[in-house]
């Protein structure tokens, strides 16, 4: 888990982040990440793990959002996925050892106790509301 920050100059006018806090916790676990933004892209959010967590850009007539995290996946499901992929995660050195992996799970379990699920999944809700009105 890491705290992501929506870029202050764009975050309030972005429909994706409507009613979302500017700083929010999110799972930050990626095998790959965006390094170079498209020429016309706007950086929406970032954190200490990934410089690019959210972008907005246009392609022809389409407005495109890209996010490097998963608001649609519950923390409980994340824990299930970590346990399911435990062997591969350890082999790939995603964690130093099993204690490190278990510590990470504990952090997520603690976050479950304090997080507002509606706010954590706000991007998904906002996106669904937008496409419902197209």
Question: What role is predicted for each listed range?
Answer:
Residues 12-134:
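Amide-donor transfer/coupling interface in amidating biosynthetic enzymes
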